[in-house]
A protein has these predicted regions:
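Catalytic cores of nucleic-acid editing and processing enzymes
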Residues: 1-324
Length: 324
């Protein structure tokens, strides 16, 4: 998981501000909800290490670069990023280990072609087994509701087409939906305007049900994320926080929170007692739909999903850097 530095590092020197490839630009930042301060991490020599990673990606044409060519998995081909799926973010974190040596960690954002774990890349923050169990529990119900809604859409459209073809018959219809003698009518028994109204009500109820279930499922998934902090490790408390503890009260947790490169890289460093020295992220593959991400370009950590998390994670890093 830890790779050696590819940049030239003369004996007795460090990949710090004295190195000619050092970039002082702040690429990773966040506001800590615990101490109320913004914490940052510069690119350092991570951009130079990213350039080396880009060359490796071009050379191998796949992300499972540790596998021999005859054992390469087509699932991990970079062709995936140049097709319908479009590109993806990759990141490199330069670290100092407990024994004083230096190395790099690598990450890709979220999943790669629906796979969370790939050899040579840091793991996700989420418990995958628990995630799979939650998805297996909720998705079939959510999908079934979606199918029923689509069926109702088709039925409603057909009813409206039929109604437009027989306007006189509809205008002459005065039968009530409920009578004292017969009770509630079924959808099939009701006149056309009433049938459409009943179908629309059923559809609205199903939409609300699906929305509620989707929200509960997403909250349950977000509860599976546990975020560590350099401060907690330094204080030997090692207590992980949930996403709901980190994000401001009343603010929803955006979809995909915790899956970006920076949180994955920092989490691995925290859990393995490594000290970050620089972090950089770049986009690889087909341009994003919005045009905001372009192949081979560097981008800072995102504001919406990462800013609160990174502030919490980086809190305490300054003290660790001072104490070595």
């Amino acid at each position: 998981m830890l790779f050696p530095l590819t940049i030239d590092l003369p004996h007795g020197t460090a990949p710090d501000a004295s190195h000619p490839l050092y970039d002082a630009a702040v690429t990773t930042r966040g506001l800590c909800p615990s101490c109320g301060r913004e914490h940052t991490l510069p690119a350092g020599v991570a951009r130079a290490e990213c350039a080396s990673l880009m060359r490796l990606l071009e050379q191998h044409g796949r992300i499972d670069m540790q596998a021999p060519d005859d054992a390469a998995d087509p699932h991990f081909s970079l062709d995936y990023l140049h097709g319908v799926a479009r590109g993806q973010m990759f990141g490199v974190l330069v670290v100092r280990t407990q024994d004083g040596s230096y190395g790099t960690l690598r990450a890709f954002s979220a999943q790669y072609n629906r796979v969370w774990h790939v050899a040579g890349w840091v793991p996700p923050l989420i418990d995958i087994a628990a995630f799979d169990a939650q998805v297996a529990k909720d998705d079939p119900v959510i999908n079934a509701l979606g199918r029923r809604i689509r069926e109702l859409d088709a039925t409603i459209a057909a009813e409206r087409d039929a109604a437009e073809q027989t306007p006189q018959a509809i205008s002459d219809t005065t039968a009530p939906v409920v009578t004292a003698d017969t009770g509630p009518m079924s959808v099939d028994e009701a006149p056309a305007p009433t049938r459409i109204d009943l179908l629309m009500r059923e559809r609205a109820a199903l939409v609300d049900e699906r929305k509620g279930l989707s929200q509960r499922s997403m909250r349950a998934i977000h509860e599976l994320y546990r975020v560590h902090s350099f401060g907690n490790r330094t204080d030997r408390a090692d207590r992980a926080a949930s996403l709901f503890e980190i994000f401001p009260a009343g603010r929803g947790v955006p979809t995909g929170t915790g899956d970006c490169c920076a949180p994955k890289l920092l989490q691995y460093a925290i859990l393995h007692n490594m000290t970050p020295l620089g972090l950089a992220e770049f986009y690889w593959g087909r341009e994003s739909r919005s045009g905001a991400r372009r192949h081979g370009e560097f981008y800072p950590s995102c504001q919406d999903k990462c800013y609160p998390i990174l502030g919490y994670m980086l809190c305490g890093l300054e003290e660790r850097a001072v104490t070595g």
